[in-house]
Amino acid sequence: MFITYGRGGFVIKSNKDKSVARASAESEIHSMSNATSRGAYELDFGKSQQHLKENDQCHLYEDNQAVIHMANNGRSYSDKTRHIKIHHYFVKQHLDNGEFTLSHCPTQEMIADILTKPIQGSQFIKLRNRLLGYEEVFPNLVWGVWK
């Protein structure tokens, strides 16, 4: 997870999942749920310290299209996703009440991947520069969470 405020990151975290997932989408939605929880805390803290405005939103970036679909539409009742627990509506709840927005981020642009995958060459340099704030990720973005 990588949380930005302005140009640079202020929360950078990488850890091994504590649960075993049957599918990659389940693992991704677990991670998104954790990132949403941390993002909600940081958003509330920023507002309480008056560093953020009351109408500021947190932007979630995800590279898995299936997870984006599940988060936007709630739990899917297909055979492949019926085992995902209902508590993952947590993400949808934050999206629905407007605190968070969710966008697709191509795998090549996913900053959090530098923490978990063996990236080399120019891709590593590009993601490292964004992670350290040397290069703007999105010029108009104030607050973002890469999961």
Which residue ranges define each predicted feature?
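RNase H-like nuclease module associated with reverse transcription
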Residues: 18-147
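RNase H-like nuclease fold core
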Residues: 1-25
